Amino acid sequence: INYVPVMLTFPTELTRSFERKNKESLSNISQSVKLPDQTPEKGEESVQKTFTEEWGGLKDDELTFVYNDEELLLLHRDIWLQMTEEERRSKKSVLDVGCGYGKEAIVLTKIFPEAFVVGADMNLAVIEAGERLVREKNVNPVVASLFHLPFADNGFDHVHCQGVIHHTFSTYEGFKAISRKVDLLKGTLFVWVYAKEDRYMVPGIRGFCVWLYWAVSHSIFRPILSRSPSFIRSFFVHLISILMHPVIMFRGRNKGKWKYANTVHGIRDAFTPMYAHEHGFNEFLGWFEETGFNPVLQRSAHYKEIFGSRLVGVGANGYRKDETIIPSGSLN
């Protein structure tokens, strides 16, 4: 649909509508053509709805969260991946798990210039972006669940997943599912998730506000809003956004580019997903080791040099255990 394969294993209103509109054509192709009929993973229908609303509202904005396009490239290439140019050019196939509206997949084509990049996401807003994305060199969008990706195991030179698996029913199960898509010999796996330590590391009143945000969002907003009808969810999101936007729009590096849509996007991400799990550093790093990777942690000090603020969350780029690891930041 709009150049985007929809490879979900469970039915949605989109696929039902497609079947109704094309019933005669489908029957001419084969009598066995039917809707996907499996049961979605726990919470997936809610996750799909809330993230479709989130990315459909922002669309192709010049900012992705707090980052402009140039900053997004620096973040992924220099802070998180830390690969040499030779390493990056050696990658021929890249899977971006949770591509949002597609901008992250475009960034990955710049980092991996020789690679065929597949941008997979369960949110249906990626379909709206389809025609634009397929015009980009080497970008290939697909709608799919990360638990049922329509690709062979061990098929990608690099799998990239930033801020996604902690929004599933089980971050650990999500990690295992995407790790199976990494090439067994020289494949790499990058993952970033919310860090449990963050809510305890900020001192003073600001630290209390961080702790309060997590407590309120997890105990009140997420359980209620993720299960509410869309119009109720949107009402509260816009109510909070109207109150917060006058404060947020004048903060940060890109305050001149910050729009109301950016505030709404941030509020939706903060309060509407059903799941937003936090994980400790040691727990997270252990997952890499269990699945056959040596993890290289993100560059926190370098992040502060570039962006002037503290890096949150925990990210690591995992190498297969028999590979020699030489992060590019260590080279002269």
Question: For each predicted feature, which ranges?
Answer:
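Short N-terminal helix/helix-N-cap motif within the alpha/beta-hydrolase-1
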Residues: K103-I106, T168-E173
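Local beta-strand N-terminus motif with an aromatic residue
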Residues: K91, F156-D157
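Conserved class I S-adenosyl-L-methionine
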Residues: T188-I224
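Short catalytic micro-motifs in class I SAM-dependent methyltransferases
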Residues: G163-V164
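A short glycine-rich, Lys/Arg-flanked "PGG" loop and its adjoining helix->strand segment in the class I
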Residues: Y172-K186
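Conserved N-terminal segment of class I S-adenosyl-L-methionine
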Residues: I1-P150, A276-H277, E283, R299-L331
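Substrate-binding/catalytic lobe of Class I Rossmann-like enzymes that use SAM or dcSAM, i.e.
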Residues: W214-T291
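A conserved beta-strand element that flanks and buttresses the S-adenosyl-L-methionine
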Residues: H160
